[in-house]
Regions:
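Phosphate-binding/switch region of NTP-binding enzymes
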Residues: 29-30, 35, 40, 146-229, ...
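Conserved RecA-like P-loop NTPase ATPase core
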Residues: 22, 67, 77, 129, ...
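DNA transaction DNA-binding modules
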Residues: 223-314
Length: 314
């Protein structure tokens, strides 16, 4: 047993792979629909960690990265690395790919690679692309809450604890924009990174992050000509999170009228109507750059906003 004083006297060490996103010895999941860019996102993350560079404005701790691919071969991965302008060396990036005659990679067969990566190279980040391409000895149903929550994720957590690295699992979203086995995965991993592309817009990707250890995160991203993810210009203006929620809503609605009281209540914003009104008025030009045009009209005793979304040409 420990007293509260003993607990407070113990040194607190918070190690991270990516600050505010991924802690050391954690298990995380990146999910998205096909063609959104899960593998590109993961390779960009790997490059940032391998070289100690910021990732989407977040600090990283430098570490070698092991990339386990169950879908792409080395040629395909090299094409993406070169297109994105990523810079890896023989000492900071390692690839384990699925053999041509294999249907899935057996997790037990990866033990020697994982051990070598952790002990001989000091690696702290393992990316598994994709979760469904990994075979466990007893088999499992990806849609089974019990299999995922009581067997699959605990297996990866066991490896994380044993070798002292963080694991990022890449997984699919289904047609309803929830991950296969989602409830169990959400409750079992340390954090979920979700990428979604709105059906009405091709240039913007929305990142949502939920975690046990860090604050939630909502970002609007775009991909540049080299396929690298960047924070949208709108985000670089320190945009209030409530305005991001409003923009996401506006993209879906396209044309609508509202008052600040109505929209604050409808979207359950964590802000007062008067505060949201001030933020909205201060960002009219920024919103217009993103394709959202807003006009104001005075009707009776209320100020009414008329919003129209037009997809940006760029």
């Amino acid at each position: 047993m420990k007293t509260i004083s003993q607990m407070r006297s113990e040194p607190i060490k918070k190690d991270f792979i990516v600050d505010k996103l991924m802690k050391s010895r954690g298990v995380y999941c990146l999910v998205a629909r096909p063609k959104v860019g899960k593998s590109l996102f993961a390779l960009q993350l790997a490059n940032s960690v391998a070289n100690g560079q910021e990732f989407l404005g977040l600090k990283t701790n430098t570490s070698p990265v092991l990339y386990i691919s169950t879908e792409m071969n080395s040629t395909q991965i090299l094409e993406r690395i070169d297109k994105m302008g990523l810079h890896f060396t023989d000492n900071n990036f390692f690839l384990k790919e699925q053999e041509v005659n294999e249907r899935k990679l057996n997790l037990m067969d990866l033990q020697l690679d994982l051990q070598d990566f952790a002990y001989n190279y000091g690696g702290k980040l393992v990316i598994i692309d994709m979760l469904c391409g990994i075979r466990l000895d007893n088999g499992y149903d990806i849609n089974s809450y019990q299999d995922i929550g009581q067997y699959v994720i605990p297996k990866f957590r066991e490896l994380s604890n044993k070798y002292g690295f963080t694991i990022l699992l890449i997984h699919h979203l289904n047609k309803s924009n929830t991950s296969l086995g989602s409830t169990a995965i959400d409750g079992s991993v340390d954090g979920m990174i979700t990428l979604k592309k709105d059906n009405n817009i091709t240039t913007k990707i929305f990142l949502n992050y939920e975690s046990r250890d860090f604050e939630g995160l909502d970002l609007i991203l775009k991909r540049n000509e080299n396929l690298l993810f960047e924070i949208s210009e709108l985000e670089t203006e320190d945009l209030n999170p409530n305005l991001i929620i409003f923009l996401n809503y506006a993209i879906k609605q396209r044309d609508f009228e509202f008052t600040v009281s109505e929209i604050t209540s409808k979207l359950n914003l964590n802000i007062t109507p008067s505060q949201f009104g001030r933020i909205l008025n201060a960002n009219i030009d920024n919103l217009q750059k993103e394709g959202l045009y807003i006009e104001q009209q005075r009707k009776a005793k209320a100020r009414v906003y008329i919003a129209q979304y037009k997809e940006p040409l760029e």
